[in-house]
């Protein structure tokens, strides 16, 4: 019984860690692209909750090209940084002094009710890169490789 309880706690811990990973792992010094590659997508706006009901996210427009994301007490700025036909987003932590970036790929279900996020692995795209051009080149080169992405985190729309 103890073993199964420990396994359960590990699974819960992993799930919580993965939900936090997409936004709290802002490790990069530069954005994917220095500016948005397209306007915001209105279907992404709204209140979302993780499938385990432990993580909340609110996505609002800042302007025509940029989102403000409220994620469990923290604020982030996000915009589309599409590369190689892949819907990447550049996410900047607005709460920290260093204002670092996270890179994610996103997918919205056809009905607009489910959003999945996968962070870009810093094992493929090094945290040491200091220019957006190199980031774009590496994302283009590795876009079809599964090891580019971390675990998928899913949210559903509340309203």
Question: Where in the sequence are the language-model features?
Answer:
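C-terminal motif of bacterial Sec signal peptides marking the signal peptidase cleavage site
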Residues: 22-25
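Calycin-type beta-barrel ligand-binding domains and close structural analogs
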Residues: 27-44, 51-159
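Bacterial N-terminal signal peptides that target proteins for export
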Residues: 2-13
């Amino acid at each position: 019984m103890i073993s199964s309880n420990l396994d359960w706690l590990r699974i819960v811990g992993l799930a919580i860690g993965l939900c936090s990973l997409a936004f709290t792992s802002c490790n990069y010094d530069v954005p994917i692209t220095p500016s948005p590659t397209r306007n915001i997508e209105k279907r992404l706006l709204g209140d979302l909750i993780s499938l385990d009901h432990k993580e909340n996210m609110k996505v609002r427009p800042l302007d025509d090209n940029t989102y403000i994301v409220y994620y469990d007490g923290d604020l982030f700025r996000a915009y589309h940084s599409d590369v190689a036909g892949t819907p990447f987003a550049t996410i900047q932590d607005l709460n920290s002094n260093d204002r670092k970036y996270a890179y994610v790929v996103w997918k919205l279900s056809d009905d607009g009710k489910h959003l999945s996020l996968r962070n870009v692995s810093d094992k493929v795209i090094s945290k040491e890169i200091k220019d957006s051009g190199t980031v774009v080149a590496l994302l283009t080169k590795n876009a079809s490789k599964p090891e580019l992405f971390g675990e998928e985190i899913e949210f559903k729309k509340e309203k």
